[in-house]
UniProtKB/Swiss-Prot annotation:
SUPFAM superfamilies: HydB/Nqo4-like. It comes from the Eukaryota. One of its GO terms (biological process) is photosynthesis, light reaction. The gene is ndhH. Transmembrane segments: none annotated. Keywords: Chloroplast, Membrane, NAD, NADP, Plastid, Plastoquinone, Quinone, Thylakoid, Translocase, Transport. It is found in: Plastid, Chloroplast thylakoid membrane. This is NAD(P)H-quinone oxidoreductase subunit H, chloroplastic. One of its GO terms (cellular component) is chloroplast thylakoid membrane. It is a peripheral membrane protein.
Length: 393
């Protein structure tokens, strides 16, 4: 009897690009020795749209609709960073009510983002049921967004100096009801997932990152906090009014895929705590800084010339960005979302550099999957939580 010869050479496999509802248009070139991963090369750029260059010939108000297309599952954060930069450049004060509204919207957006991470992550490792469950709660959040902003996604709600509109009548009660309901939903997820032996088999001791490695690779967000580093920009930078609320930074020390799952589940609970405190303590007053309406517009601007008057309505009130540079950052669901902004006394930014958390967190993927099994790639990639819109920009 002849024994079939076994192949000794390595196999190269293309994984992706995937459907946008899962991991987006990310392509991985994986080198395999049987089931073992020898090498992995991510290929990016399929969703590159030149977002940084577009910013250089748009005013901030004109650019706001573009930024919601970076991380299209947590659009409030991209809007927040876009208005925070010019606010700091122009030293524009935010009314207290507007700051509270912003915090509420940001934390709701964080929960929605974590929910839509949880569903596909569980589907990746073989649990289909949570994928359908998460849409119940996420739909309620989108109903709240729609009532306040008019849009379920791509809200275009933040403005320099405040927000576009005040909260509608009855919205606060509706949001408090959601918070009470959502806490029971998280308990259901934890019962279903956290102690499940098949789930634990797939995620424990898979994709381990030490605290030192996480810092050296520049990781942020749940990737960093799951490796034992208590670093959250909401505590570090005290932007908006986070220092007025009672909440804790959520972290784990194991550094594996399970730790990253636990950090995100705990973060959703903390977000609910912040939202409840903000809703109960929200002050009255204006929802935007009315001084911002009277920005110093350029005298005799070409926009006021005769030939421009009949093209469309005049552009929104805007102001010159001072000739200086600035780095602003917020704690987005995926990590540190930053903008490096250079003004040059023009209504357009001279440079608008985006620091997306997903792009930097993704750099460690080839190191994490080496010497792992092929099936573990989806577990590790899912635990990183990437959105290709912000990775490719």
């Amino acid at each position: 009897m002849t024994v079939p010869a076994t192949r000794q050479d390595l196999m190269i496999v293309n994984m992706g690009p995937h459907h946008p509802s899962m991991h987006g248009v990310l392509r991985l070139i994986v080198t395999l020795d049987g089931e073992d991963v020898i090498d992995c090369e991510p290929i990016l750029g399929y969703l590159h749209r030149g977002m940084e260059k577009i910013a250089e010939n748009r005013t901030i108000i004109q650019y706001l609709p573009y930024v919601t297309r970076w991380d299209y599952l947590a659009t409030m954060f991209t809007e927040a960073i876009t208005v925070n930069g010019p606010e700091q450049l122009g030293n524009i004060q935010i009314p207290k009510r507007a700051s509270y509204i912003r915090v509420i919207m940001l934390e709701l957006s964080r929960i929605a983002s974590h929910l839509l991470w949880l569903g596909p992550f569980m589907a990746d490792i073989g649990a289909q049921t949570p994928f359908f469950y998460i849409f119940r709660e996420r739909e309620l959040i989108y109903d709240l967004f729609e009532a306040a902003t008019g849009m379920r996604m791509m809200h275009n709600y933040f403005r320099i100096g405040g927000v576009a509109a005040d909260l509608p009548y009855g919205w606060i009660d509706k949001c408090l009801d959601f918070c009470d309901y959502f806490l029971t939903g998280i308990v259901e997820y934890e019962k279903l997932i956290t102690q499940n032996p098949i789930f634990l088999e797939r995620v424990e001791r898979v994709g381990i990152i030490s605290g030192e490695e996480a810092i050296n690779w520049g990781l942020s967000g749940p990737m960093l906090r799951a490796s034992g580093i208590e670093w959250d920009l909401r505590k570090v930078d005290n932007y908006e009014c986070y220092n007025e609320f009672d909440w804790e930074v959520q972290w784990q020390k194991e550094g594996d895929s399970l730790a990253r799952y636990l950090v995100r589940i705990s973060e959703m609970k903390e977000s609910i705590k912040i939202i409840q405190q903000a809703l109960e303590g929200i002050p009255g007053g204006p929802y935007e800084n009315l001084e911002v309406r009277r920005f110093d517009k350029v005298k005799d601007s070409e926009w006021n010339d005769f030939e421009y008057r009949f093209i469309s309505k005049k552009p929104s009130p805007t102001f010159e960005l001072a000739k200086q540079e600035l780095y602003v950052r917020v704690e987005a669901p995926k990590g540190e979302l930053g903008i490096f902004l250079i003004g040059d006394n023009s209504v357009f930014p001279w440079r608008w550099k985006i620091r997306p958390p997903g792009f930097i967190n993704l750099q460690i993927l080839p190191q994490l999957v080496k010497r792992m099994k092929l099936a573990d790639i989806m577990t590790i990639l899912g635990s990183i939580d990437i959105i290709m819109g912000e990775v490719d920009r």
